Amino acid sequence: VKTCKGYRCENNTGEHPSCVLNINAIIGNRKMNDGEIAEFLEKRRILLDGFSTKDGKTFPTVLELADDGAVNMQSVIGRCPHCGGEVRVGTRAFNCSNYSNQEAPCSFAIWRNIGGHQLTLEEAKELCEKNITSSELEMYREDGSIYRKRLGLAPDKLQIVKI
């Protein structure tokens, strides 16, 4: 049910609510829209851009719906297949947390837009966990023609290649 403050379960009203689900309309200084809420409730995880800190710095994150109804922000999507570090959501790429590690820097990154295809959270997780996407993705050539390829890791596990 949509309310003046956000969204709540229809069973989260009255004197004796039987459900605790309550999602604020504004999370991280960002207004949520009805479509995002519907996808979030269906998948329980959603990658979104446009959140901002109190200082006004914008950032992307993954919202997760916990079993207790809490909404959590999670920037880590998986483990780096190259070095084992954390892969985090960035504005233009999913990056290894060890990129600035002085002793063992890691340059692993998955661009969020590859060949005109906007990678989903699920596709990025597949690349981290299985080293390849499970299905072909629709991409575009420079001339606008469409082609389909799977994405996978190069042998060095540092680069994403089209297969």
Regions found by a protein language model. Give the residues of each.
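Basic, low-complexity terminal or inter-domain segments flanking catalytic cores
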Residues: 1-163
